[in-house]
Amino acid sequence: MDTPNKDDSIIRFSVSLQQNLLDELDNRIIKNGYSSRSELVRDMIREKLVEDNWAEDNPNDESKIAVLVVIYDHHQRELNQRMIDIQHASGTHVLCTTHIHMDEHNCLETIILQGNSFEIQRLQLEIGGLRGVKFAKLTKASSFEYNE
């Protein structure tokens, strides 16, 4: 018989909330299609842990992962080349890019990045500030372990 992994065990605990906060939690469960309060609370905790992990300013921590979504006018002169130059000059690892044509004027590009939080966020600001970029949103993640 396999011994349960520490990560596999579920611990039950209770939380005290005001009624209006509980009502808001229950509304989000319905709105987002969660099967239980526990599922929503677990996701909220994970999201907060990722947020806190990104807030730790450790230039040697290369465990940050992010996806940068960029929408831009592909008729803007030399914009694509400037975006590529910024990626090459960055201290971040560009793991993958995907480019799609949305319509006759707009392209959407996703850029998957790995590195430290400062370099990733700097790349997002540099690309987002280019003339012709209409949207630049960074979705942050982390590859750190929660059980340490």
Swiss-Prot record:
Family from the record: Belongs to the transcriptional regulatory CopG/NikR family.
Name of the featured protein: Putative nickel-responsive regulator
Entry keyword set: DNA-binding, Metal-binding, Nickel, Transcription, Transcription regulation
Keyword Acyltransferase: no
GO cellular component, one term: protein-DNA complex
Taxonomy of the source species: Bacteria, Pseudomonadati, Campylobacterota, Epsilonproteobacteria, Campylobacterales
GO BP terms in the entry: negative regulation of DNA-templated transcription; regulation of DNA-templated transcription; response to nickel cation
Assembly behavior: Homotetramer.
Keyword GTP-binding included in the entry's annotation: no
Alphabetized InterPro entries for the sequence: Acetolactate_synth/TF_NikR_C, ACT-like_dom_sf, Arc_rbn_hlx_hlx, CopG, CopG/NikR_regulator, Ni_resp_reg_NikR, Ribbon_hlx_hlx, TF_NikR_Ni-bd_C
Residues binding Ni(2+): 88, 99, 101, 107
Matching Gene3D superfamilies: ACT-like. Chain A, domain 2, Met repressor-like
Cofactor field: Ni(2+)
One function term, GO molecular function aspect: transcription cis-regulatory region binding
Organism field: Helicobacter pylori (strain ATCC 700392 / 26695) (Campylobacter pylori)
Function: Transcriptional regulator.
Cofactor annotation comment: Binds 1 nickel ion per subunit.
Signal peptide span: none
